[in-house]
Every structure is written in C-alpha cells, then in structure tokens.
Amino acid sequence: MTTTAPTTSGPARAPHDPAPHDPARVRDVVGVGIGPFNLGLAALSAPLDDVDAVFLDAASEFRWHPGMMIEGATIQVPFLADLVTMADPTSPYSFLAFLKATGRLYPFYIRESFYPLRAEYDAYCRWVAARLGSLRWSRRVIAVEHDPAADAFVVRAETLAPDGSVTGTEEHRGRHLVLGVGTSPVLPPALRALADEVARGEHPGAGPLVHSAQYLPHRDALAAAGSVTVVGSGQSAAEVYRDLLDGVHGDARRPGYRLDWVTRSPRFFPMEYTKLTLEMTSPEYTDHFHALPLELRQLLGREQRGLYKGISGDLVDEIYDALYRLSLDRPVPTTLLTDTEVVAARYEPAARGRGDTGAAGEPDAAGPAGEYVLRLRHAQLGREVERRTRALVVATGYAASVPAFLDPVRHLLRFDELGRFDVARDYTVDDARRVHVLNGEEHTHGITAPDLGFAAWRNAVVLRTVTGREVYPVEERIAFQTFGLPDDAGPATAPPPTASRTADAAASAAAAARAAGEAR
C-alpha cells in the first residue's frame, strides 16, 4: 500500500515559457513580483478569456519565506485563505485541489487542523505556479515607463541566468500595472550600522548577525556560536527562540550555551483570534479605516499591528512547557526581557592572548572570536544595561517601500505627505486607475493589507477594475458589527471641547506600539 498518490488531477502543468516573447504585444495586465498575492491574481486571471496577463519576478522559481521554513511551523490563517477560494471556491487552483492532486486530502482531513504547515503552503503555491502559463521567472524589472500613444505601461526587465548574471533585456507592455513586490526586512536603527559593518566583513570572525528572514541558512552557525540573542516579539521571534531552545539545532543544556530573548513589547502578546476582532479583516472595516484622517490612521495602524503580528497562543504555551521541562534539574541559561529596547550596539573582538568565553563563562574555542555588546533600555525603569552575545537574530518585521523602477512614472502616481503610496479604496495609486498595489497599503487600508485571507477579495476588486465587470462576486458586507456610527444614528455632532480624541488615541497608540507583534 502506498501513502501518497501520483499527481494526476488538477490543471495541466504549464510550460515555462508558453510562447515567444513579443515586445509589441499590449496586455491587459503586467504584474511585477510573484509572491502569494500576485500568484493568486494570476490564478484568478487564468480562466478569463478577456484578461491577457503576464507576471515577472527576478527569482528563478517560487519560494515563500525560505529563511523561516522551520520544521513543523504552520501558517497563521486557515486553509480557506489560499490563493483563490475566498473569490472562487470552484477554482482548480485551490488548496483542496492541491491536496486532492497530491493524494493528501484524506490525511489532511484526518489531521483535523485548519492551519496548513508552512512548508505545505509553500508546496501548494509552487504547485499552482507550475500550472500557470503567465509567469515569467528570472526577470528583474529595472524601469517602468508610460507610452501615451499606446496608452500602456512599458515594463523593462533584465533576463537573468541561473547564476544571476544578466543575459539580456525584455519589454512588456500592459494597460494595467499590478505591483506585488512585497516588503523588505527591517532592522532597528541601533543595529543597522553594525549589521552593515558585519556584512562588509569589517569584523572578521564575528558571529552571525542576521534578520529572521535569513534564519535557516545561518541556523547551524547560530547554534554553534555559544550564545544567541533574539530581538523581536512576533511569531518569527518566537519560532526562532523555540527552535534554538533545545533539540537538534540548539540545546539550552549544553555547557556554555545561552539563549536570550529581548523585546520592547510590554509582554509576549498572543495573536488575537476572537471572532468579533477578526471582523476587522472585513470590507466594512477596511472602508471605515480608509475614510479616516491620515493622523488617526497612523495611530490606529500602530495600535492594531498586534492583532496580526502577535504570537500563536499554542507556540507561547509550547515555549513555556519547554522551559518548564528544561528547568527540572537545573536553571535554564536563558533570559526573557520585555519592555526592553536595544538602543545601541557594537562589536568587541576577543582580547589578544586570552581565549573567548561564552555568555555563561564557559570556554568555547569553536565559537566566534568576539562578542556583540548590546545597550538595553528598560522603558518602565528608565535604566540601561549592557548585555553580551556572540550572535544575533533580529526578528523585527518588514516594511513596504516605493520601488526605484517606478521613478520614470512617479509623476503619474499619488503619494502622501510621508512619501508613501496614496492608495485609493480600489487599490489604485494613479488617477487613471491603472496602477494597482498589493500589500503596500497598510497605512491606507489597515490590517487587511498583508492578510492572506483577504488577498482573494482584493484581487477580485483588481479584476473588476481591469475588466469593467464583476468577474468574481465582491462582497460589500460580511460583518455583524457596525464600524463608526449606523446610518440611522442621527446628525453628527462635534465632541465636547474637553474630549481630545487625538490625544487619547495617541496615548493608547504609544503604549500599543510597544506591543506590536514585530516590535523591536
């Protein structure tokens, strides 16, 4: 008896490049970036005869957060939040179709968990990508221009060899441009300069100093360093800490090994899964948030990050249980510091003529030749201390930015006073409604921007704009609660002079900002 079935069902596998490139062809859509959001748009576009689309990415193939593909880790949304189901439950590109095609539908059913493994979600996306003919890999977009005569965008891309060298250039023309370029890792200011110094090789023999996005390639070196400090408070920080705490890659019982966790969050906040809170990932709340003044959106945005960047409650419990188990025979060499910010950092090489020692004072000849010295400030106490560590994992999140390749068309785009995209409710950033942004609109649309569960709905809105018709039903109301005031609440009145909503919101947001799931 076999445990897996051959891959026979599902949409046929697409060729890598189904047709010769025609630079004069004007498509309906040119997408830049092939992460889950643009991949979902490609899948929803595939069956549409009136949408001619192509999607470009510099990568050679689909890979979703490869640096955090930790064994056993799950995604934090149910399997229904796949690439297509929330827009088209009958799509052949659904997660359930993938499970059926790969012989894993019944095992998944018996497993009785709504949350797929992270590696499983990556395999699903790769399965979908292999079956779409609209994807062009190894294309690095270098410039976007506008051709008024053709009323189309001209997307210039370098073609890349497997080693990353440039082999040529291409032009792709499209009436609509969809930006799905994702976000980039962010380091706190106190660590940026030091990380750059290490990357430039200015500290020979220094231990790893990496963002969590690059955790797996450095995991063995981190575990071998002798002492590791994790900075951050969200799911990524928790997963790295748990992975290094004990087991194959880290062992808190090993002589000289030390693992610390530092966050400026007041506590290790779990992600909130209560149902009325989840209604904030709805079209109605997105409408409400988008209509608020910029200043209030700024405050609410900082406050609400903890709603989707917290830690899985199960993982919090698992970490505690591991610490409890490890502490049975002796204290665990670990320190968990909350409400504590890294305000400065430097590297100190080992003193000449003496062997380096680990954070716990044990000799460790195999470890790095020096230590990182972190200056930490405790917010409540107002005091600063220094802590030493041989390696650092910085799990402080990601941020969106405006790609440089848009410089030739910046005059066509809208920006707010902080230089960010001024994204309309329909996800466009130009007055002609031709340039669409996916996951670059958290400051205008709130917490639905990075949400995998809302991506299919957003893509249905994009396709409605592209085609001029509602290809997939776009729900307008799904929530039981009302955000703002009901329509029959009577005429609006100003708050009394003594009530300062902005001041109250600012105070609330200041406290909540430290609780943000990916806070430094």
What annotation goes with each model-predicted range?
Residues 2-60, 108-235, 239-497, 517-520:
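Flavin (primarily FAD) cofactor-binding/catalytic cores of flavoenzymes
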Residues 60-61, 80:
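Non-catalytic nucleic-acid substrate-recognition regions in nucleic-acid-modifying enzymes
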Residues 64, 95-98, 127, 457:
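Tryptophan-centered motif/residue detector
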Residues 65-78:
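Glycine-rich phosphate-binding loop and adjoining beta1-alpha1-beta2 segment
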Residues 77-81, 85-93, 268-271:
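Short, solvent-exposed beta-strand-terminating loops
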Residues 86-121:
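A conserved beta-strand/loop capping segment in the N-terminal third of enzymes
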Residues 501-520:
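Long, low-complexity, intrinsically disordered segments
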